[in-house]
Amino acid sequence: MATASVSFKSREDHRKQLELEEARKAGLAPAEVDEDGKEINPHIPQYMSSAPWYLNADKPSLKHQRNWKSDPNYTKSWYDRGAKLFQANKYRKGACENCGAMTHDKKSCMERPRSVGAKWTNINIAPDEKVESFELDYDGKRDRWNGYDPSTYTRVIADYEAREEARKKYLKEQQLKKLEEKDGEEGDENVASEEEDEEDGLKIDEAKVDESAQMDFAKVEKRVRTTGGGSTGTVRNLRIREDTAKYLLNLDVNSAYYDPKTRSMREDPLPDADPNDKFYVGDNQNRLSGQALEFKQLNIHAWEAFDKGQDIHMQAAPSQAELLFKSFKIKKEKLKSENKDKIMEKYGNAASEEPIPRELLLGQSEKEIEYDRTGRIIKGQDVALPKSKYEEDVFINNHTTVWGSWWKDHQWGYKCCKQTIRNSYCTGLAGIEAAEASADLMKANMARKEAAEDEPVRHEEKRLATWGTDVPNDIVLDKKLLDEALKKEGARRKEEMDERKRKYNVKWNDEVTAEDMEAYRMKRIHHDDPMRDFLH
């Protein structure tokens, strides 16, 4: 209700006021009228339709919502394009030197530059243009349709109508051509009758509607028509499908999840129901139907190609990715067909070959064959066994058996010489004996190696004794050699004290004897010995 002043109302009056507003919104009561006689839309909320208290409005009105600060000088008119004003007969001072118009200068002139301007010729002086200036508001400056003439769109409509007429004419010609080809041999009467039937079948009669399906739609409620946009004269029941929202198909909490933000339900809400009776089986069906699979394959191909170094990106260049995917599929099919042809050329095609004889399939035939006691054929024709594609009974390189007549250690060979190398020369019994001898020698070597691994040689004791870490108890030292070793050790220690006395022709002896080790031990200073200071 668009009331200006707020006065106290009883509970009954307030209830009647609410009922009146609901009736106006439903279109069952006439809308409220303002002081100018215009109807007020009942759907306008009260905080917008009620005038403020300081306006002292006695009657309902919407004037307080109008722009009372509007500029009276504002106009929606636009430039008069191409309008001309006064045209002079001779050049005027300050006019354009090229055309002679006063509204612009030579730099801004839009005419073709003359060889001799109007300033010097006074010929063909151009008229002055109509220059206008408008005061536009914020929206007017940004209105892209400001100054648009709707009548110019009639040319577009005319183009579409001409195109539609040409299309209908072409379709009619094609239909007549088909009818003439189909009924060229029949009479003119039959041709005319069938042509009419064909045209009637091609046309769609929009007036034929099933009345039983429109019974609910025919229910009309009488309502009052208002100009405020609140309701229309007749309101039909548009919800006649009687469908159910997908989130109401199964009210179980543990059923398919419904996302209210995206309005999606991926899983099937009724998985146990009959598929023939279900209209909705979940949004995942759209991912496995239509062009979704092709788009998925396209994305996978783009990812794999990018990983292999191809400069391809599905989002940055989708057309390029699609063309590359098409060329990839063509090459793949071509390669597949080439491989198939090679295999069929090499092994043949059992599907296209001649059928197998019946006697081979069933194991019997109607042919009568008689044999004697030795197995020879007396009467009838001998059954020719199928030949192998390999040459049979052909001995090469002096072999007496064919390749594959001998098998040993997962290898094929010749039985005559027991060789496993194909196309080798036959060695006969000598080759067999040599192969056996080499095999026996290999076995003996392997047995000897195993025995040697069981008893390792003791070289470690000799090395330990040489370096003095472990000296046997039964060692016998020569006194002369020991004295010489002591002298040599003393000389070596003196050389360590002063290496400058060492001569250039020194001969070193790397052999270490037991006497040398004993002399070294006797001359060595033990750091833990308390009498080490009295040794020298």
Swiss-Prot record:
Superkingdom of the organism of origin: Eukaryota
ZnF (CCHC-type) spans are 94-111
Report the GO terms under cellular component.
spliceosomal complex
One Pfam match: Slu7
Which keywords does the record carry? Metal-binding, mRNA processing, mRNA splicing, Nucleus, Spliceosome, Zinc, Zinc-finger
Give its localization.
Nucleus
Please list the GO terms describing molecular function.
pre-mRNA 3'-splice site binding; zinc ion binding
Q: Does the keyword S-adenosyl-L-methionine apply?
A: no
Ranges of Acidic residues composition bias in the record: 182-200
Q: InterPro entries from the entry? A: Slu7_dom, Splicing_factor_SLU7
Q: Where is this region: Disordered?
A: 22-42, 178-201
- Which biological process terms from the Gene Ontology are attached to this UniProt entry? mRNA splicing, via spliceosome; RNA splicing
- Is ATP-binding tagged as a keyword? no
Annotated coiled-coil positions are none
> What family does the entry list?
Belongs to the SLU7 family.
Function recorded in the entry: Participates in the second catalytic step of pre-mRNA splicing, when the free hydroxyl group of exon I attacks the 3'-splice site to generate spliced mRNA and the excised lariat intron.
Name it: Pre-mRNA-splicing factor SLU7
